[in-house]
């Protein structure tokens, strides 16, 4: 059990108590929010100041936390792990900015859980893996407690505790810190969430998930100090801009959503609807044809390599997608969606599976993980942005393309430095935006506006 499982235990127990809870996830992750939504019944919202902005993070949290009695944010990595955490230089605390900086003025924990906690003025519950600790637990807790005095460590959850004797040693060690113990989770070898090459297996592929959530709720009912924990989770009234009005639906967008394609930010889908799009969800795995009377297509990321055979065997859909795009229908394809538009996917075993063939290249699975935030500059006018426009996104994949386009969409670099990552992305045909870079449109509402403008032109 790790941070995500502890979070799910909290959410499951709250829902068993019939409490409405809104969950959030720090960072760009897609899969953890799927688990949150499965438990709470509400879309989880990502809080990522790199993909969006600090202001957007504040407004997103304020807007959605007001809708429920309780709010819970799951962090990312360690508390202070941000995109510039590897900068080695003296640290100082810039009280006027509320950010931790080095002697170059760089924020050293930007986009970390600590950064979000400061930005939203939220208390932090520290989850400590105690499986190989006794007295050292106090040193760890004290280190986190004192590292940045602006972070409010409200208490600790002791995770993977062994015997009663082990728990006694941990409690004795923590007494001098006067830090509340808000939960104790014993070692649970029978509670595991399967994972694979890109992290946890998504919820749609776990038939036993409901039984697992029930076990987590049982655990949560007894392992947490709810009397002291519930006040920390209570949603507080926060000022935020009014919800934008929905434009009348004037266009239909086919959104591929099934076991193969399920990496979407709910905020992106909401934006499309607010701008007047009717979203038609469909399955390239199961459907007999693409949806009728649509003026655009949106293929998110996911795991087409896992379902490559089933995608390949659905020839009517493959042919329909290719025909529609070649006839001019605008299409966004991110990562897994990009792979689906290729001629073929070559899986981890070297087997080749035919895809739609819109793009004259193949996606080859491999061991190398490409991961990180990207700054991407558009090299030409394309479906979504004008030449010279800079967008911020992230990559997370274990595939590569056999052919680089002669006129790529973007020149990319790492977000936290000037290291050039090369050119990527297909914008040919001109009505296609196919890229490994995942985008959150909270930073640039102009992107979905431009997409829908092109869809209306096609209509």
Positions of the model-derived regions?
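Phosphate-binding active sites in nucleotide-utilizing proteins
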Residues: 251-326
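Residues that mark the start of a beta-strand
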Residues: 19-22, 250-252, 278, 355
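Intrinsic disorder/low-complexity segments
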Residues: 65, 84-108, 236-250, 456-459
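ATP-dependent carboxylate-amine ligase catalytic core
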Residues: 1, 5-85, 105-119, 128-152, ...
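Amide-donor transfer/coupling interface in amidating biosynthetic enzymes
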Residues: 191-240, 365-459
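Cysteine-nucleophile active-site neighborhood
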Residues: 304-382
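Internal gly/pro-rich beta-alpha loop/helix module
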Residues: 134-240
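Beta-strand->loop->alpha-helix junctions that form or flank phosphate-binding loops
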Residues: 25-26, 181-189, 278-286
């Amino acid at each position: 059990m790790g941070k995500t499982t502890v979070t799910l235990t909290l959410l499951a127990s709250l829902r068993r108590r019939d409490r409405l809870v809104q969950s959030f996830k720090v960072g760009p992750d897609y899969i953890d929010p799927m688990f949150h939504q499965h438990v709470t019944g509400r879309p989880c919202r990502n809080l990522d100041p790199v993909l969006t902005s600090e202001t957007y993070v504040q407004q997103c949290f304020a807007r959605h936390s007001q809708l429920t009695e309780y709010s819970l944010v799951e962090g990312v990595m360690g508390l202070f792990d941000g995109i510039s955490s590897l900068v080695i230089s003296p640290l100082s605390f810039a009280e006027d900015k509320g950010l931790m900086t080095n002697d170059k003025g760089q924020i050293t924990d930007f986009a970390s859980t600590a950064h979000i906690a400061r930005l939203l003025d939220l208390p932090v519950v520290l989850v400590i893996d105690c499986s190989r600790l006794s007295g050292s637990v106090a040193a760890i807790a004290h280190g986190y407690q004192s590292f940045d005095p602006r972070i409010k460590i409200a208490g600790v959850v002791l995770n993977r505790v062994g015997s009663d004797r082990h728990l006694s040693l941990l409690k004795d060690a923590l007494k001098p810190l006067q830090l509340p113990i808000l939960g104790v989770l014993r070692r649970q070898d029978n509670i595991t969430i399967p994972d694979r090459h890109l992290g946890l297996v998504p919820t749609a592929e776990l038939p036993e998930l409901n039984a697992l959530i029930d076990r987590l709720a049982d655990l949560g009912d007894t392992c947490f100090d709810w009397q002291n924990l519930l006040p920390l989770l209570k949603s507080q009234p926060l000022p935020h801009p009014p919800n934008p009005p929905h434009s009348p639906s004037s266009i239909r967008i086919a959104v591929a959503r099934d076991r193969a394609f399920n990496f979407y930010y709910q905020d992106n889908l909401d934006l499309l609807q607010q701008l007047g799009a009717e979203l038609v969800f469909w399955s390239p795995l199961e459907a007999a044809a693409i949806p009728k009377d649509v003026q655009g297509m949106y293929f998110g990321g996911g795991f087409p390599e896992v379902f490559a055979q089933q995608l390949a065997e659905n020839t009517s859909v493959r042919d329909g997608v290719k025909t529609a795009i070649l006839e001019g229908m605008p299409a966004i394809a991110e990562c897994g969606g990009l792979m689906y538009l290729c001629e073929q996917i070559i899986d981890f075993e070297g087997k080749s599976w035919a895809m739609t063939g819109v793009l004259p290249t193949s996606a080859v699975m491999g061991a190398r993980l490409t991961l990180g935030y990207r700054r991407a500059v558009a090299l030409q006018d394309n479906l979504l942005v004008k030449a010279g426009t800079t967008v911020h996104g992230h990559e997370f994949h274990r595939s590569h393309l056999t052919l680089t386009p002669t006129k790529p969409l973007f020149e990319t670099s790492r977000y936290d430095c000037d290291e050039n990552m090369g050119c990527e992305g297909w914008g040919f045909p001109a009505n296609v935006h196919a890229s490994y870079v995942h985008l959150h449109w909270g930073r640039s509402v102009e992107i979905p506006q431009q997409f829908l403008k092109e869809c209306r032109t096609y209509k």
